């Protein structure tokens, strides 16, 4: 699959398909969107929010969560604020999210089946990583959005004038965003 993508890219570049996407690194709307990496949102999310290329920084991860005050999602938001001029942040979760109800036992079985040994997992634990928590999903989408919004709003490095709001989008039917 990667070879097919690279071959497509060669054609894309040679035909200058990139020209209509040229913009600078600063988001025109001074907006960052933290959302889930779900493939249903790839085109739906920007379309449902009326965003075009260059309007916003879109940060994606499993569940659209900030799971720690100093995780990579939070780091990206801090960079967006201080380096890219972001003044508003939308946390956008979605219905029927795969990260909801994730559990370590499932991941453990899949890892073992794919050749990761218990010895490796135990070594990671001995290094202080709580794999159970790290791979745990959330039980309620509304609660996860509120928690993420609160983590961002109360972060010691986020200025008080940055607007942070949370939404849930219907990823299967209408693309409607609601609080």
Language model features with spans:
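Short secondary-structure capping micro-motifs at structural edges
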Residues: 74-81
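Conserved beta-strand-loop surface patch within small alpha/beta domains used
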Residues: 15, 19-74
């Amino acid at each position: 699959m990667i070879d097919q993508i690279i071959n497509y890219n060669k054609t894309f570049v040679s035909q200058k398909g990139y020209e209509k996407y040229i913009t600078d690194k600063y988001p025109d709307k001074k907006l960052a969107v933290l959302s889930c990496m779900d493939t249903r949102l790839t085109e739906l999310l920007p379309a449902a929010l009326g965003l075009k290329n260059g309007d916003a920084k879109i940060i994606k991860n499993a569940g659209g969560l900030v799971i720690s005050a100093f995780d990579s999602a939070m780091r990206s938001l801090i960079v967006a604020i201080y380096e890219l001029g972001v003044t508003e942040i939308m946390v956008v979760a979605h219905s029927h999210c795969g990260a909801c109800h994730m559990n370590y036992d499932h991941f453990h079985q899949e890892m073992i089946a794919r050749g990761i040994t218990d010895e490796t997992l135990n070594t990671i634990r001995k290094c202080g990583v709580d794999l159970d928590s790290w791979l745990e999903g959330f039980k309620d989408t509304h609660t996860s959005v509120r928690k993420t919004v609160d983590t961002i709003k109360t972060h010691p490095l986020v200025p008080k004038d940055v607007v942070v709001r949370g939404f849930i989008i219907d990823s299967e039917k209408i693309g409607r965003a609601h609080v």
